[in-house]
UniProtKB/Swiss-Prot annotation:
Belongs to the beta/gamma-crystallin family. Has a two-domain beta-structure, folded into four very similar Greek key motifs. The N-terminal domain (NPS) binds 2 calcium ions. Keywords: Calcium, Metal-binding, Repeat, Sporulation. Residues 2-46, 48-86, 91-135, 136-173 form the Beta/gamma crystallin 'Greek key' domain. It comes from Myxococcus xanthus. Protein S, induced in large amounts during fruiting body formation, assembles on the surface of myxospores in the presence of calcium ions. Changing residue 40 to R: Suppresses completely calcium-binding. This is Development-specific protein S. PROSITE patterns: CRYSTALLIN_BETA_GAMMA (PS50915). Ca(2+) 1 binds at residues 8, 38, 40, 77. GO terms for molecular function: metal ion binding. GO terms for biological process: sporulation resulting in formation of a cellular spore.
C-alpha cells in the first residue's frame, strides 16, 4: 500500500511525514506531529491520490493531488484536513525540461492540466522539451486552458519542434 509524504516546505523540503490511505482531521494530523497550516508540498506515488482541504472536517477550498506537487498554490501552508485514497495504478506520461529526455523530469497520470496545475506539479510554463507518453495519448497545447496550437504525442518524442519550450496546458488519456 502506497503512502503520500507531506512536507513543511515547498520543493519537498523541511519536516516530512508519511500518511497511508485514510482520512485525517486536524486533530489526527496533530497527533502525527503535523501542525495546522504547515504543509507546502506533497509526494504522491502511483496507487494513491490526496485531497487537501483548507478547513478541518474536509471542508472549505480543496485541491486533488495525483502526482508529486512541489507547491500547493492557494493551499500552501493552509491545509487543515486530508483524505488519502487508494486508486488503481495507472501509467504516467513523462515530461522532460531538455531535449533527448534529459534534464528535470515530471511524471503525470491521465488527466487535464492547465498552466496552474502544471506548475503545481513542477512543470513551469513553456519548459517542456521532450516527452515519453509511456502508452498514453498526450496532447500539448501552446496556450493555457487547452487552446492554441496543439501537438499530439503518441510515441517517444525526443524533440518537440515548434512546441519546444512552448507548452502551457496538457491533456493525457
Amino acid at each position: 500500500m502506497a503512502n503520500i509524504t507531506v512536507f513543511y516546505n515547498e520543493d519537498f523540503q523541511g519536516k516530512q511525514v508519511d500518511l497511508p490511505p485514510g482520512n485525517y482531521t486536524r486533530a489526527q494530523l496533530a497527533a502525527l506531529g503535523i501542525e495546522n497550516n504547515t504543509i507546502s508540498s506533497v509526494k504522491v506515488p502511483p496507487g494513491v491520490k490526496a485531497i487537501l482541504y483548507q478547513n478541518d472536517g474536509f471542508a472549505g477550498d480543496q485541491i486533488e493531488v495525483v502526482a508529486n506537487a512541489e507547491e500547493l498554490g492557494p493551499l500552501n501552508n493552509n491545509v487543515s484536513s486530508i483524505r488519502v485514497i487508494s486508486v488503481p495504478v495507472q501509467p504516467r506520461a513523462r515530461f522532460f525540461y531538455k531535449e533527448q529526455f534529459d534534464g528535470k523530469e515530471v511524471d503525470l497520470p491521465p488527466g487535464q492540466y492547465t498552466q496552474a496545475e502544471l506548475e503545481r506539479y513542477g512543470i513551469d510554463n513553456n519548459t517542456i522539451s521532450s516527452v515519453k507518453p509511456q502508452g498514453l495519448a498526450v496532447v500539448l497545447f501552446k496556450n493555457d486552458n487547452f487552446s492554441g496550437d496543439t501537438l499530439p504525442v503518441n510515441s517517444d518524442a525526443p524533440t518537440l519542434g515548434a512546441m519546444n519550450n512552448n507548452t502551457s496546458s496538457i491533456r493525457i488519456s
